[in-house]
Amino acid sequence: MFKSLLVFITFALVLVSFNHAPESAANEYIEQYKDLAVVEMYRTGIPASITLAQGLHESNYGLSKLALEANNHFGIKCKSWWTGKTYFHKDDDFDANGNLLESCFRAYRSTVDSYVDRSNFLMQSERYKHLFSISKDDYASWAYGLKESGYATDPQYAQKLIEKIIRYELYKYDQSEDPFRHLLKD
């Protein structure tokens, strides 16, 4: 009886720790990068909620190998014209026989560089230009627009971003004051 109870308690603790880990990691990620997301929102018009949701999703709360070893928090691949640092990682590219290939991803000196480059990537790419006519307060249209424009292959990508925005109340960062407002006063 005691042994069964001990096994049950151990199992319950393991389940709680697994369920707690993403919440804890998500909250730490948000706390660490929320200001950067707001700065990028005012620099580019991309909602901070979308930036944080993508960062959480694409980097697995900042814990993915790509985020930890290449500072790439958005899963941006190299493309043929990329001249910066690179990092090779198996993702979603297959050869003709169905074998998973290593994909070339952009590597960054810092997470700040990853955030800035991702914003620039969206602003400079023709396929994302239409997103910039959407209000920074309309995170749902941004999420669906990113998916429809081909940002991700996951058919549930937009819903996953929206789910994170609602779950972690990321929409509140879209209402943040411009961090440079005080510099613009006479």
Segments (PLM) and residue ranges:
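Catalytic cores of secreted/periplasmic lytic hydrolases that degrade extracellular macromolecules
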Residues: 2, 11, 15-186
